[in-house]
Amino acid sequence: MVATPSTSAPTKGVVRQVIGPVLDVEFPAGKLPKILNALRIESKNPAGQDIALTAEVQQLLGDHRVRAVAMSGTDGLVRGMEATDTGAPISVPVGEATLGRIFNVLGEPVDEQGPVKTSDTAPIHRSAPKLTDLETKPKVFETGIKVIDLLAPYRQGGKVGLFGGAGVGKTVLIQELINNIAKEHGGVSVFGGVGERTREGNDLYEEFKESGVINAEDLSQSKVALCFGQMNEPPGARMRVGLSALTMAEHFRDVNKQDVLLFVDNIFRFVQAGSEVSALLGRMPSAVGYQPTLGTDVGALQERITSTLEGSITSIQAVYVPADDLTDPAPATTFAHLDATTVLARGLAAKGIYPAVDPLDSTSTMLQPSVVGDDHYKTARAVQSTLQRYKELQDIIAILGLDELSEEDRLTVSRARKIEKFLSQPFFVAEIFTGMSGKYVKLEDTIAGFNMILAGELDDLPEQAFYLVGNIEEVKAKADKINSEK
């Protein structure tokens, strides 16, 4: 396990000031809690209702006072209430018992399924793994999804940015990745819902149950743990829930020695919450009103997401770009940490091409001959140049029609349309909607299939045979079926 912050003996303090989610607490001389320690306040408000609140120490003010940020609403809190220093940072449950459950930032279950059956906990603030413990050789993480594995491969222990508007298939893609890592890699997933809508979190949970990612009958057979800090919660909770999810993922990597997928939706909300907390603590804002510690905050989270010699955490982070401005400090700082980007295009979704991953806009630092090999690299670049040429010809086709193109361009268009259709595939988690069995396509089969299309070996097969299939053998079988029905 990575080194954890030292703990100190619990002491009692008194709340002296409450301003929104920020509270000042006075402690006896020489008994001040350490920075990042959790304070616990358990009392009754004037109406006699119970108050149970956790806050995290952010500043030592002098005069035996500390300033802390609350992890839940401060309604009913009054001066004079007793606050206990827990002597350690916020800790969350870890291990197999977390699978199939939903937690808040404090690691408390919020799914009404009873207490978590584990005594194992870990603090959310920890050091990143030492350089000597890191796996430095880049290794491709096979997802079984053709378009990703061929054109924008993920790095094992890397970070991927997931870009896309509403309704283009982000959730289904996330579910499929969770399903595939469990079945093919024996890994598990952790989902961190950071500052998004409660409705979306509920929908995701229900869809996970529907698709079998969460097994409601036997939670131990589930493939994912969920950790939510929704947009109605105080900024402290939204700022820390990403670390709570990451801590659960680190346990699977470091103790169980598994490959883990960590989903963060949305990484921008993590930065936004940090900005709110920074302003509440009275720090001078930096560019565009963001916190002056923006780079450090993002780095502290991202540096813990990595491959070690024991296992890996591969992170897929949904990135909201405010006002579509890629130069905004929040997305710009995030981009510096990403190894790959998966861009979902509405135009492809409208054509019925699922997954709607844009083959020209999606990128990966792994797509280089020294990492993926010459064959993979050349195939990927040939596929992209064919699709790029097709894109350039679309205006001419729209105005003059296909017949006005040269023989060579007509052939390019024909192959590009087959490539576009072959980049689609049926998903396991979508079986209940499509009625088609899902397909996991091995990387070598993907490369071989696209090479055959590019070489013209499949020019005589009908276009629709390439739509929503797995490997090239299925294309041929589908083509035979189409021809026999004519």
Swiss-Prot record:
ATP binds at G164, G165, A166, G167, V168, G169, K170, T171. The keyword Lipid biosynthesis does not apply. It catalyses: ATP + H2O + 4 H(+)(in) = ADP + phosphate + 5 H(+)(out). It is a peripheral membrane protein. It is an enzyme of class 7 (translocase). SMART domains: AAA (SM00382). Its EC number is 7.1.2.2. Keywords: ATP synthesis, ATP-binding, CF(1), Hydrogen ion transport, Ion transport, Membrane, Nucleotide-binding, Thylakoid, Translocase, Transport. CDD domains: ATP-synt_F1_beta_C, ATP-synt_F1_beta_N, F1-ATPase_beta_CD. InterPro entries: AAA+_ATPase (IPR003593), ATP-synt_VA_C (IPR055190), ATP_synth_F1_bsu (IPR005722), ATPase_a/bsu_AS (IPR020003), ATPase_alpha/beta_chains (IPR050053), ATPase_F1/V1/A1_a/bsu_N (IPR004100), ATPase_F1/V1/A1_a/bsu_N_sf (IPR036121), ATPase_F1/V1/A1_a/bsu_nucl-bd (IPR000194). GO terms for cellular component: plasma membrane-derived thylakoid membrane; proton-transporting ATP synthase complex. It is found in: Cellular thylakoid membrane. GO terms for molecular function: ATP binding; ATP hydrolysis activity; proton-transporting ATP synthase activity, rotational mechanism. Gene3D superfamilies: 2.40.10.170, Bovine Mitochondrial F1-atpase, Atp Synthase Beta Chain, Chain D, domain 3, P-loop containing nucleotide triphosphate hydrolases. F-type ATPases have 2 components, CF(1) - the catalytic core - and CF(0) - the membrane proton channel. CF(1) has five subunits: alpha(3), beta(3), gamma(1), delta(1), epsilon(1). CF(0) has four main subunits: a(1), b(1), b'(1) and c(9-12). Belongs to the ATPase alpha/beta chains family. Produces ATP from ADP in the presence of a proton gradient across the membrane. The catalytic sites are hosted primarily by the beta subunits. This is ATP synthase subunit beta. The lineage of its organism: Bacteria, Bacillati, Cyanobacteriota, Cyanophyceae, Synechococcales.
